[in-house]
UniProtKB/Swiss-Prot annotation:
Record PTM: S-nitrosylation is required for the interaction with GAPDH.
Organism: Homo sapiens (Human)
Biased composition (Polar residues): 394-403
Encoding gene, per UniProt annotation: RILPL1
Recorded disease: Oculopharyngodistal myopathy 4: A form of oculopharyngodistal myopathy, a muscle disorder characterized by progressive ptosis, external ophthalmoplegia, and weakness of the masseter, facial, pharyngeal, and distal limb muscles. The myopathological features are presence of rimmed vacuoles in the muscle fibers and myopathic changes of differing severity. OPDM4 is an autosomal dominant form characterized by slow progression and onset of symptoms in the second or third decades.
InterPro entries: DZIP_RILPL, RH1, RH2, RILP_dimer
GO cellular component: centriole; centrosome; ciliary basal body; cilium; cytoplasm; cytosol; nucleoplasm; plasma membrane
Domain RH1: 10-97
The protein's role, per its UniProt record: Plays a role in the regulation of cell shape and polarity. Plays a role in cellular protein transport, including protein transport away from primary cilia. Neuroprotective protein, which acts by sequestring GAPDH in the cytosol and prevent the apoptotic function of GAPDH in the nucleus. Competes with SIAH1 for binding GAPDH. Does not regulate lysosomal morphology and distribution. Binds to RAB10 following LRRK2-mediated RAB10 phosphorylation which leads to inhibition of ciliogenesis.
Effect after changing R300 to L/E: No loss of interaction with RAB8A
Protein name as it appears in the record: RILP-like protein 1
Post-translational modification S-nitrosocysteine, affected residues: C47
Amino acid sequence: MEEERGSALAAESALEKNVAELTVMDVYDIASLVGHEFERVIDQHGCEAIARLMPKVVRVLEILEVLVSRHHVAPELDELRLELDRLRLERMDRIEKERKHQKELELVEDVWRGEAQDLLSQIAQLQEENKQLMTNLSHKDVNFSEEEFQKHEGMSERERQVMKKLKEVVDKQRDEIRAKDRELGLKNEDVEALQQQQTRLMKINHDLRHRVTVVEAQGKALIEQKVELEADLQTKEQEMGSLRAELGKLRERLQGEHSQNGEEEPETEPVGEESISDAEKVAMDLKDPNRPRFTLQELRDVLHERNELKSKVFLLQEELAYYKSEEMEEENRIPQPPPIAHPRTSPQPESGIKRLFSFFSRDKKRLANTQRNVHIQESFGQWANTHRDDGYTEQGQEALQHL
């Protein structure tokens, strides 16, 4: 009773929560509260009153469960996607800047080559003129006037200044080219660092997705286990109540029969009750096809072991997919953005909400079976009135086992 009150309070608090704060546990609490209300309606009006309504309510609760689970996972994925898009845009901008810089360097190099070619042609022309002058000078007389000597000296000085200017221009352009090369190397290092950062963020994103899927699988397994245990507990309590009611009716009937027989039969009445209880225990242990063959703790252990195995299998599958993706990346050797993983279409397993409502319908079937057993017990009471004895005969024990 305390557990039922606690679950009812949890469901009411879940109904009062804000829509953005709902969790999967709140959805299951709401489903439990709706199931209890359905059970009350079935007890009062029968199963036909909600036969068409129950599947629709179950479907609505399943849709709510899926939406709540997506709402909790979506913000983290959106942040990671925005970060990845931002890094891609930065990378594209840097690549574009690098291309522009390369084009500028090519233009500067072309200009420098053109100027150097012009200067070389001028030097060749001056050297040719110098040779011609030297040959002319050798053929003429050695007697030069002072004016001619000064003129020749002025021409050589002008050529020397031109050569000096050309050398300065060439050195300056060489320094500029070296500076541009250093700047280009730094830009390439920045691009490589950004690519490494992008690959690291992609791996972190993949690990986070893997962890989110594992946590979702574990949460769903725990929720399903809780629902199954609650349903088993409810069925056990209802079975205990029905068995107690049957035992009370049998005892009242036997006490009424023995009170009519006088003083001798009340002395044997406790023995009869003990034999009834023993016979009922034997019948429950041997003839009941639905008798418990294991304890509740064993059932919990089996469910826990099954959930652990499921989570391990899921982890191994994710690791295998991760290693396969790494091998593909190593084969390609080109950092590419990861493809958007589409969820694989697989048959949807039965949700905990359907399982919960199936337990409620199963309880109604058990109540119908208990009513049938009460009818059989009344027929057995008539048979016992006709075959009274000091103790139960073998036929009476067989009838109890049948019950």
